[in-house]
Amino acid sequence: MNCKILFRKELNDSECELSLLLVGDSDMKEINRLRRGKDKTTDVLSFPLEFDFSPLQKILPKNTSSDQKMFPPIALGEIVISIDTLQKQAKEIGHSEKDEFYRLLVHGFLHLLGYDHERGDKEEHIMKLKEDECLEILQGL
């Protein structure tokens, strides 16, 4: 994903990976109940590995080619997306399921990096700007 351009500071130009799980509403409701205590479905959940990125900026080499990397990719965590809710929201919003998938993926990815719109208006604004930037890049692909 070319969104890496937007996250160089957080990732220090390092390779990263994440797990993506696509489920139906019933499975999403169960995951949401077990992990967050909310007995309802939702569109996307993120489960970061609680990794502190700040030491990476000190130890990882910058701008090295992939064959020169000394470290394995950083495992960021897992994103879970409900396909049922994705389809409903795409129809309600009036855009394609592909666009809604990208929107949810980017939203989940930002949560893995520590962005959180629930921490207040300022954080919500910052996260929304990052989402919009990344979605512009994805729409250009």
Swiss-Prot record:
Classification via Pfam families: YbeY
Cofactor binding comment, as recorded: Binds 1 zinc ion.
Primary location class: cytoplasm
GO terms for cellular component: cytoplasm
EC number(s) reported in the record: 3.1.-.-
Record key words, sorted: Cytoplasm, Endonuclease, Hydrolase, Metal-binding, Nuclease, Ribosome biogenesis, rRNA processing, Zinc
Requisite cofactors: Zn(2+)
Annotated localization: Cytoplasm
Cystine pairs: none
Keyword check for Zinc: yes
One BP annotation, GO: rRNA processing
HAMAP family hit by this protein: Endoribonucl_YbeY
Name of protein: Endoribonuclease YbeY
Organism for this UniProt entry: Leptospira interrogans serogroup Icterohaemorrhagiae serovar Lai (strain 56601)
